[in-house]
Structures are given as structure tokens and as C-alpha cells.
Amino acid sequence: MPTSSRNPSPPRRWGRWLSILFAAGVGALAALWVAVHTFDWAGPLVANSLRSVIGVDNVAALEDFVYGIEDRVNRFSRRSEAPKAYWRVPAVGVPKVKSVLGSAGTGGAGAAGGAEAARVGQDRPAFRPTDVGPMHQSWSAPGDGEWVPILTRGVRQPLMFKTLLHPDESRSWAELFVVALDLERLDVRLVAGSKEPQANNKAAESYQRLAKIPEPEQASVLAAFNGGFMTEHGGWGMFTDGISLVTPRDNGCALFAYKDGSFKIGTFSTLRATVPDAVWYRQGPECMAENGKLHPGLLASHVRKWGATLDGETVIRRSAVALDRAGKILFFAITNHTTAPVLARGMLHIGSPTVLQMDVNWSYPKFVLFEKDDPNGKLKALALASGFEFSDDEYLRKRSIRDFFYVLPKQPGLPKAESP
């Protein structure tokens, strides 16, 4: 019997549909990746949605996998890329010139002189951290390790400086941005997010979370930066406004602010006796370095705790806080494409004997400066450097889901902050 022509066999149709579905899936993942790296809301939305469906550990495994692929791609596509500078640094022998507040690079917003910010510290020696130079002399960009002043509105002398390091000899695109804050002239305050850290103390259930910079202080606020991990990522402690939102863990590293205006950082068990004198404290994982020594765990081949659930060797965006040896300078760091050991060594190079890692991942670490948006005079946020996610309303009019810190000039003659 002659064979009649028929429609394509089912296997062919299935193969075609599978190819279409595969292509659509790849396209969707690519679009999702672009969205996460473009919109500040996309990363948290995707991560939190996935955690509620497949669980925290599975999301962490997925993140490790995706970041691992990204690092392999970068190692191939950027292997001949030289370390990059983000702002101009005065040449050797040329007097240091005050830079203007704003995004990194040669531009940025002008430093408007607003009467709303106190003019502080004029009778004290000018603040300037000591240059540390590059971590790797043969693997650096011009100006690595040199402090560049940030001049903010209403303050005649720079109270904050910035520098850049390239801390990883195997990745030219690994970058460590550090801001130094003069704690003799600046107040740093801690604000709970609208949802994080989730409280685990009954006394904190009725705590009213403002989750943004109080309006009366927005006139003089200079900068703000991210806080720590979500409660489900380690249960690290937080205390502010006289309320313990999350019970501290003895082994956690903690940054303390005290009623006398001083700051300390270290393992919580060593600072527990100082809690009654604290205005606030915020914990994170074990100190990456303490008293000048790198944590032994960061030398191990497989470490998870410094990324909460992520592996310590995962190449991601990270943030950290530290103090100089005298406790007079607060350093805040934010990175691109670094492992936990690389971040820790970079902070030791800056001159910080004890280092506390804060939040990680693409969307969460951020440092923003605040300037007036001429001509309407509306305050807006500006990123420290290009490539960091933020919104104009960051910490101002938009409530933050996660906790954060903000920075004000100390008001001469006013009492220091007291916890209720």
C-alpha cells in the first residue's frame, strides 16, 4: 500500500516547541538579569518572591550558580581590561583640591551652600585621612588609595573623603570604594527598615518604624548608607531608639554608637557590658578581621557565613563598616565583584583593624549623598559612583524596606543623642 504524506511527526513538533520554550526561557532570564541590574526594586522583588516559593537555601544555591557564571564570563570577556579610575585625583605635588559632592567621575552636583546645615568644626584642624596607596602597585588605577575630599552643602571643610582600591590581582574589575567619615564632626544614626530586620522580641512588636530620614533632619542630612542582613539571614542583632528589635548573638560582629559620641566595633560578647551606654548597635556575621588579624574562617576553602547564605568565595557586591585604630574615623566600603577575603584584606589595607561586613548582593549595598535639585530646591540622592543602584528619593520620601544609617553634621552647643 503506497505511503501517504502526513503531517510532521509528533517528535518533530515537540522538538520545535521545546526549542521555542528554551529560547523564550533564555530570553526571559536575560531580561530578568538586565532588570535586576537596572532597576533598584527588581532585585529585592525577585529574590524575596523566590525565597517564599523555593526557600532561602535554594535561592542561595541559585545565586551562587548565577554569580559563578557571571564571574566566568567576566574572566573571559574582561581578561585584558585594565583597572579603572572613577574620579580625578590631584597629581603628585599639586595641592589637593576639594571635590564637589556627587557621582564619581569628573562631574557631579555642585556644592550648594545651604544655611540648613551647620557649619561645624571650623576651630579644629582640617580632617584628612592618610593616603594608603594601591594594594597592588602593578595592578592599580591612577589615584588608588589616595583620599579625595567630598565637599557637601553648608559645610566649609570636607568632613568625608573617598578613595578607590583594586584589591584583587586576578580581577581588574573588582573594585573597593571607601568613604571616610570624620566622627568628631559627624553624627551617624541608625534607622530600622519598614520590614527588616524583622523583630524577634515582643517588646519591639509595637515599635513604629519610620523607615526614612526624619523630615526635620532632611535639611541637614549629608549622606546615608545601607545596614545589615535580613533577620532570616543569620538573626543578627539590632538596637535603636531604646528598643532591641533583634536579640544579639554573642559571636556576631557589632558596630556600637554611644551616648558620649564615641564608637566601637568588635565581637558582641566583648562589648556586651557597654550596652547600657549605647545609643544604637547593629550586628553582622563574625568580624571579618579583628585587632588587625583576618578571621581564620576566611582562609578556609569553603565559607558561607560572610554572605549570610552565600558562599564567602562568591564574587558579588558587598559592603562593610570599620573604624580606624583611634575610633575617630568611620569607614564605609562598597564593592564590585569581590569575595569576602578580598573585601577584608582591602579594609585592613585602609587601616581598619576590625571589619564588619554589612549587606551584600547587587541591589542592597549603597552609599548616597544628598544635594538640592535646582531649580526647585528639592533634596535628592546621588550615588557615590556610577553603576550603583539608587533612586532620587532614596531614604528621603521613599520608605526603606531595610535598615540604614544616615549622616548629619554635629550641631555645636546641642546635646549628644541619648537613647530613650
What is each of the regions a protein language model found here?
Residues 1-15:
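N-terminal Lys/Arg-rich, disordered targeting/topogenic segments
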Residues 16-246:
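Zymogen propeptides
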Residues 174, 250, 316, 398-402:
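Short, solvent-exposed loop/turn segments at the edges of secondary structure
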Residues 190-349, 353:
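Aspartyl protease catalytic domain
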Residues 329-333, 338-394:
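C-terminal soluble interaction/assembly domains
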Residues 380-420:
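Low-complexity, Gly/Ser/Thr/Pro-rich intrinsically disordered linker/tail segments
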